[in-house]
A protein has these predicted regions:
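Long, charge-rich low-complexity segments
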Residues: 36-51, 55, 108-115, 139-151
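Amphipathic alpha-helical interface segments
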Residues: 1-73, 79-86, 100
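Catalytic phosphate/nucleotide-handling subdomain of diverse soluble enzymes
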Residues: 61-147
Length: 151
């Protein structure tokens, strides 16, 4: 999903395509169903809706809740709150949602008031700047290889 979004795909379309792919894979049914549940859920952000997707205790449930939060939230903060304020494994679902949101709109994340209090914010900001540079200038790859060696 994230690779498709990084390539310019819409989150909802990327998720639907991923669900279709997983539905065809041996053992992929649970993941496909979890993604489809997030896509079908009403975009009301209600706790009951989040809980209908599970508790986030399995990878499939955590992905479903994080995806739902990103689709249901009208802002970075609202989406992250949806992912973080349920009775399940909310630290995991919020972390996954935060990564999705950062990919969807890195500028909104970096200028949000919470960005200043995140541990490692300076490192995260540098990674975002480098990613954005690479996304807009393929020639930056050689320069960034010096910073991030290993291929």
């Amino acid at each position: 999903i994230l690779a498709d979004v990084a390539g310019g795909a819409d989150l909802e379309k990327a998720a639907a395509q991923t669900a279709e792919t997983y539905a065809r894979l041996p053992g992929g049914e649970e993941t496909a169903q979890a993604i489809q549940a997030a896509l079908r859920a009403p975009r009301d952000g209600a706790g009951e809706t989040v809980e209908s997707l599970g508790g986030g205790w399995t990878a499939e449930e955590a992905l479903s809740i994080a995806l739902y939060a990103c689709l249901a939230g009208n802002s970075f903060e609202e989406a992250l709150l949806i992912a973080a304020t349920h009775g399940g494994d909310s630290d995991s679902t919020a972390a996954i949602a935060g990564n999705m949101l950062g990919l969807l709109d890195p500028a909104a994340v970096l200028r949000h008031r919470w960005a200043e209090i995140v541990e490692g914010a300076d490192i995260i900001s540098q990674l975002v700047r480098d990613y954005r540079q690479l996304s807009s200038d393929i020639n930056a790859a050689e320069e960034l290889f010096e910073v991030y060696p290993g291929g």
